[in-house]
Amino acid sequence: MNSISITWNGHSCFTVEKDGFSIVFDPYGPNTVPGLAPLSLTADMVLCSHEHSDHGYTDAVTLKHSGTKNPFSITKIDTWHDPEQGALRGPNRIHILESDGLKIAHMGDIGCPLTREQKDLLKHLDAILIPVGGYYTIDAVQA
């Protein structure tokens, strides 16, 4: 099957699903994102871009332990949450999922320019999940 489902759960939290296998990205904690209800999700895997409570609250996700085979290959790219090489907000990790010729990247709270090598890893994306708020992350022009 060559179909991937992407569901936005609020803030930078997404669920990506293929062939019955689901991955939740960046679950946020209670009261960390104004206006959003607490999360209560179920998935086979959780991936977090960094350890801030609005991106790394893994307690919001119940793992299925279903034994379903992971159809994705996962590439991780270490970046920064700010333009000062992490001095302001620490590290960030980009996750790239690939399956059956489809390629998706979750950028986390990227806050820095990418190197040529990092950009090369992000070529030929079918979907990109990217923040563009401009305060804690890059802005729309930088994106």
Residue ranges and their predicted role:
Residues 1-45, 52-54, 64-127, 134-141:
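Core dinuclear metal-dependent hydrolase active-site scaffold
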Residues 60:
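Short phosphate/oxyanion-binding micro-motifs
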